[in-house]
Amino acid sequence: MATKTVRIEQIGSPIRREASQRATLVGLKLNKLHRVSELEDTPSVRGMIRKVAHLVRVLDDAAA
């Protein structure tokens, strides 16, 4: 069985954001605007996306 994945794109800059938000973007493998990252769809990744929801956009949401 294939694991579910989620694709996210960074749409906001981490400049003048809290260090924890910058670290969350690094954890999501994002570092520059309009970069796309594909990660395994797990509760921890979903929580990280929720933490920086104002800086990222979910491109593919298999759960919806």
Curated annotation (Swiss-Prot):
Look up keyword Chloroplast and say if it applies: no
Q: Which residues form a coiled coil?
A: none
Keywords attached to this Swiss-Prot or TrEMBL record, sorted alphabetically, are: Ribonucleoprotein, Ribosomal protein
Q: According to its UniProt record, which protein family does this protein belong to?
A: Belongs to the universal ribosomal protein uL30 family.
HAMAP family, alphabetized: Ribosomal_uL30_B
> GO molecular-function annotation terms?
structural constituent of ribosome
User: Which Pfam families does the entry mention?
Assistant: Ribosomal_L30
**Keyword Transport: yes or no?**
no
Q: Which InterPro entries match?
A: Ribo_uL30_ferredoxin-like_sf, Ribosomal_uL30_bac-type, Ribosomal_uL30_ferredoxin-like
Q: From the Swiss-Prot or TrEMBL record, give the protein name.
A: Large ribosomal subunit protein uL30
Task: Give one GO biological process term.
Answer: translation
A GO-annotated cellular component: cytosolic large ribosomal subunit
How is this protein organized at the quaternary level? Part of the 50S ribosomal subunit.
